[in-house]
Structures are given as C-alpha cells and as structure tokens.
Amino acid sequence: MSEQLQPQQSMNAADEIIGRPLAQGLGEQTAMLCAERSITYRELDAATNRHGNALRAHGVGKGDRVLFLMDDSPELVAAYLGTLRIGAVAVALNVRLAPRDVLYVIQDSACRLLYIDAEFLHLYQQIAGELEQPPQVVVRGDEAPAPAIIAFKHFLDGQAATLESVQVAPDDVAYWLYSSGTTGRPKAVMHAHRSVLIADRLEREYFGIKPGDRVFTTSKMFFGWSLGHSLMGGLQCGATVIVAPGWPDAERVMATAARHRPTILFSTPVMYRNLLREGAGESAAMRDIRHFVSAGEKLPENIGQQWLDTFGIPITEGIGASETVFLFLCARPDAYRIGSCGKRVPWAEVRLLDELGNEITTPDTPGLIAIRMASQFVGYWKLPETTEKALRDGWYYPGDMFSFDADGFWYHNGRADDMLKISGQWVSPGEIESCASAVPGIAEAVVVAVPNDDGLTRLTLFIVPEDPSASQQKLSEAWMTTLRGTLSIYKCPRTIQFLEELPRTATGKVQKYRLRDMLQATL
C-alpha cells in the first residue's frame, strides 16, 4: 500500500511549492539560475505576488484559465505560481504549436488571459481574428504592438509584492497539462492543488536533494516531467533550479551544465543518446553530476549500458504520465536493472491486471497496469466518457502493458493498443525493440504493424542507425541474426526500413501513428 497523506481542509499549491523553503528560512537561498541571472526564494515570492495581483487587477479569479506560450524563464515560473496563488488555473503550452493548434487550445480552454513571448506573438496574431471571445494578452519582450495587447512591464507596474494566497479545497483544479498527442489531438489533463503535496519526495528520498543542490531538467516546463520535478519538486526541496531558455539540444545542455554545474539531471532517452553522440563523456561538468534520471519513454538498454560504461554512474530510469505528473515506478541509484523502469515508489499503489480484471501475482506475466496516487489527475477537460474510462474506483488505468520480475522490478511492454496478435499469439513491440536496439550500430528501433493485402497483420521494423553512412545491408543482416537467435520466429518483423530520425512529439515521444501512415501510403 502507498503511504497516505493526511487530509487537508484547505491549501494552495503555490504555498506548498515555495512556501515551504521560505518557512525554513531559505529566503536568501538561490531559487533559480538562468544565464547571468540569479533569483532568490524571497525575490521569486515577491515576483509571484506581483503577478497574482496583476492578474486579479485584470479580472482573473478562481477557476479562470491562464495560458502560457512562453519559453522557460524566471518570469514564466513567477507568473505560473502567481496564477496558482490566486486560485486560477495555470496552463503551460508547447511553444512549438502551429497557429491552428494555438487556436484550438484557446477555444478549448476558454482562457481569460494569455501570457506570450514576443517571439511567439505571430502565432497568436495569425488566428486572433477567428476568436469570438479573445483573451487578454500580455506580451514579454517587446512593447505591445497593438492596443489590445499589454506589455509585460506595464502589466506589473504598481503591483504590490505581498499577496495572501487564496485557500482552496485540495481537489480544486490548479493546473492543466495538455497531453503530447502521440495518437492525435491532445487532451487537457486537469490536476488538483493536492497533487503538489508529494512533489519533493522523489528528489529527497531517492536522490538526497537538499538546499544547495542544483536541479537541471532538459525538457521544457510545459512537459509534466519538467514541471513536476523541476518547477515543483526542485523548488519544494529548497534546491536551485536551473532554467535554460531555448529549445534543448545536446550542445546547449552541455553548455548549460558547464555554466551552472548541476548536481542532478532529469532528461529523456533521446537526449541521453544525443549527449553520448556529442561527447558528453569528455565534459568535466557532466562528470560532476551525481545523478542522472530518465523518463518520458522507455530507455533503450544499449543507451543505458553505454552511459554506465562511459560515466560509471547509471541512468536511473522511471516512468510517470501526464495524468500522474510524478513517477509511479522508479529505480534507485543503488538498486537498478538496465531495461527496467524500477520498482513501485512508496507514495503510489500499483496493480497489474489480466484481461478479466483479475490481479496478476505471477512474475513475468504481462498485464494492464492500474495506479493510485495523490497526484493523479481529476479528469480530462470536457471529455467525461474518456475520463470515466481512465478513472475507475479511484484508480487510473493508462492502457499500458507491464510485467514485473521475481525481484519486483517492473518492465514497460508498450501500450495495450500497441499489443499485436501475430499468427494467433500476442506480441509486445517493446520486446522486439529492445532486442533490435541491442544490435551494434542501431541507435533506435521501433516496431509498427499494418494489415497486408491478405488482411493479416505484418510487422515492420524502423531503424535509426548510429552512423547514417553505415551499410544498411550489414545492419539488416546483423539485426536478422540477432532477432532470429533471440525471439520466436513469429515475433520477427518481415520488413525493415531505415530512417534518419523518428517522428516525435515535442516532449520526445515517438509518434507511431505517423510511421503507420507511412506504411499505409506504400500499400
């Protein structure tokens, strides 16, 4: 059973995130580093309050949605926390949205106010004329280009640096996360104020993060992985959060590490792969990092092993979801298995179920996972049927297949709707992908299936080679030898296709539906 939180009658998420370090006397401790800037907890609290007061002055109140189309910055953090502090709902958006997606999200959320960076303002301006009820717009970076748009500095002019938080019920909605859309249009995942009560536990209990530590998350803050374990968890620990503007790439990550010297790095499998390619093993700053943590998608075993060989420190793998914000399974630095996403964390309950809903207790038996934890979402915005399917009797059913071994280590076998029946037998794409990724010269491997002309399902393996100039024939032969020597014949893909890179969402997850579309177009 998970550890139960003591019930609270009222609270505010912003108080839990930055109120704790302030109550511990850490007001002069550095809360954030961003390029040349250093912001203390006292300064962050004051900026948070100014934003909260400004939002109120512009008619934003409890339950109103506030959207953020902003690059990561101290201003984003302060505005986000200010939104929470007045009981409004904070919604950080992917800064790479197309104009039509910006239109969709504004209409879907019925937002009251939009914070936007000047560099992204053109996205809004392209669709503003289609909005029947346009939000108030606050732009950071330039003077307001039109009377209907408010310049950032004018928005905050004269606003007090003190503000009493609005106390809300723990189950009141605090923020949304738009899902990354691996299968289509994203959903707004609604989270309650209570979700932040466990924000610091992974950092504290698994990695010993405390004041003086520096937390660096390579993903952008609109992604739950970064929002939960950087903005929320890192600050709640009283640590220093490294804020890195700009779209992340390996070179930029290493430059940020060299400048700010993080003690823990939260990242994704694709970034760890790119860091290895970029020569991260030669970086003194990277070698000084105590802990490396990975989530977002399954970490290929070859990347995990290469990292361990290079740094002598494992990548600690875990798994969470937009619907839980925080990880529900995670390895420990001193208790891990390459290829596994770890064990159940103490603050979550996890069950494995068969097709009839019976709990699976036998190791190495695939089943559907069910999760219950304090941070799980309260529902999908305006999608009651989808919510009812995912949330049942207090448990969250993500539709993912897992198994666990005799020692309690869990393994992600892919989405339940990705499970394939080949020659009358169920096949896990994850098993095939792990096997293919172990072949020397293969950087990434993804399996998808489409029906052939005969109506039968056939597997295709998409491969990204480590060296684009490598012989595809030799890689194909090595792949076939390895798979046929490891897997049952019905699990071996019939065809192989080479790609320079896999299609991904902005948060790094592979978009398998686009690969299926590619195959369908060739039939």
Curated annotation (Swiss-Prot):
pH dependence: Optimum pH is above 9.
Enzyme Commission designation: 6.2.1.27, 6.2.1.37
Keyword Kinase attributed: no
GO MF annotation, one: ATP binding
Reaction catalysis annotation: 4-hydroxybenzoate + ATP + CoA = 4-hydroxybenzoyl-CoA + AMP + diphosphate; 3-hydroxybenzoate + ATP + CoA = 3-hydroxybenzoyl-CoA + AMP + diphosphate
Pfam families with a match to the protein in the record: AMP-binding, AMP-binding_C
Disulphides: none
GO biological process: secondary metabolite biosynthetic process
Major enzyme class: ligase
Swiss-Prot/TrEMBL induction comment: By 3-hydroxybenzoate.
Keyword terms: ATP-binding, Ligase, Nucleotide-binding
Record InterPro entries: AMP-bd_C (IPR025110), AMP-bd_C_sf (IPR045851), AMP-dep_synth/lig_dom (IPR000873), ANL_N_sf (IPR042099), Benz_CoA_lig (IPR011957)
Superkingdom as given in the UniProt entry: Bacteria
Function per UniProt: Catalyzes the ligation of 3-hydroxybenzoate or 4-hydroxybenzoate and CoA at the expense of ATP. The enzyme shows low activity towards benzoate, 4-aminobenzoate, 3-aminobenzoate, 3-fluorobenzoate, 4-fluorobenzoate, 3-chlorobenzoate, and 4-chlorobenzoate. There is no activity with 3,4-dihydroxybenzoate, 2,3-dihydroxybenzoate, and 2-hydroxybenzoate as substrates.
Record NCBIfam families: benz_CoA_lig
Annotated family: Belongs to the ATP-dependent AMP-binding enzyme family. Benzoate-CoA ligase subfamily.
Protein name per UniProt: 3-hydroxybenzoate--CoA/4-hydroxybenzoate--CoA ligase
Organism: Thauera aromatica
Lineage per the UniProt record: Bacteria, Pseudomonadati, Pseudomonadota, Betaproteobacteria, Rhodocyclales
